[in-house]
Amino acid sequence: MRLSRVAIPALALLGALALIDGTADSQQCPKGKLRLYTSWPMQGAMLPEGTGMKNGVDLAVSETGGVVAGYCLEVVNLDDASPQTGKWDGAVEAENANKAVADPLAIVYIGTYNSGAAKVSIPITNRAHMAQVTPANTYPGLTKKRGAAPGEPGIYRPTGLVNYFRPIPADDIQGAVGAKWAKRMGFKKVYILNDQELYGKGIADVFEATAKTIGLPVVANEGIDWKQPDQKPVLTKVRASGADLVYMGGVIETGAQVIIRQMKEVGLVAPRTRFMGPDGLLEEELLKGATCDAVLATDMRITFAGLPFEKMRGVGAKTYETYKTKYGKEPTSYALYAAEGGRVIVDAIKRAAPQIEKAKDVTEKREAVRKAIASTKNFEGINGKWNFDENGDVDYDTMSGFKVVKADGPIGCKFQFETILE
């Protein structure tokens, strides 16, 4: 029987499964089944990106016909957002991770989108020897000490093993690159805002530290209460400071749309003041929510970890075209990284298959896959060939810079690649 891949909410029954382009019978699955769990927001402003990442995993698994080394792959999609807020919720993320590790067929956990959510789930998957692969988390402290809080990343590794992997560069690279770009663009004074969340404050802190090192004056690095609809009090301070750049560490759900709209309302517009942010803002939903008039008025710049789709070559270019053909739309920012993570997992299962078959229990199966992922080398990825280092990070640091320009269509503007950043 063919089953379609479906998204299920965090409280849905564990039995809601999906087999990608495969047939769940004993002939096609001689060695049984393995399950991959995904977890990120699938509602509110995050629904387009969440769907894009889900599609990316789907793409990677569908390339195998749903069967790897005699094992049928089933994908269980979970939503870690709260129905009340539409944003990620720590309690929901913990429930998702616990649901995955309690499933004797679960082999890998794919997620999260928000770095704060990863802080919740990594220790849970680590205790279960389950590999966790993220398509989007970039907070440095999840894997390394640079740019991290005290105790990180060890506090996320209760077993002492590295089980968390990300095929995307971390913010200690992106935040630094953003500050250097601002310096090269000729900005004289920057006012940093952050959403006081793990990702947003983390990248803002790295931007600040780098700016001070390279001689770019920083007026302040101020945390905002992003739940407040009126950000004009802080923007009035920004205007009085004389800063010619506002840098905001955050994501689209945590105040960026309001900040940009109200920057225009208080006169913080180009050429007097411009706006820059990290890849957590590289979403069409930002343009819709902030309005193109406001975005264009601030002459926005956004940094992104990796290459823009149109600049990819080889595997990246092929994946981009395959995604568009399969889903009839452009990939979202992290959709191809979800595909990359899925392919890493498929490759690891192939290499670990003999150990999985000999394993005495699910912990040994998971450990075999974890070790295989950790040993990933010379992987032909969307941004070229790369390796995982001892922290579970990729060893490339390609970054891109985007601006926003006018465009035809219902939105009225779009992100456009501007430069490769180093």
Positions of predicted regions on the chain:
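Extracytosolic ligand-binding ectodomains
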Residues: 2-6, 14, 22-422
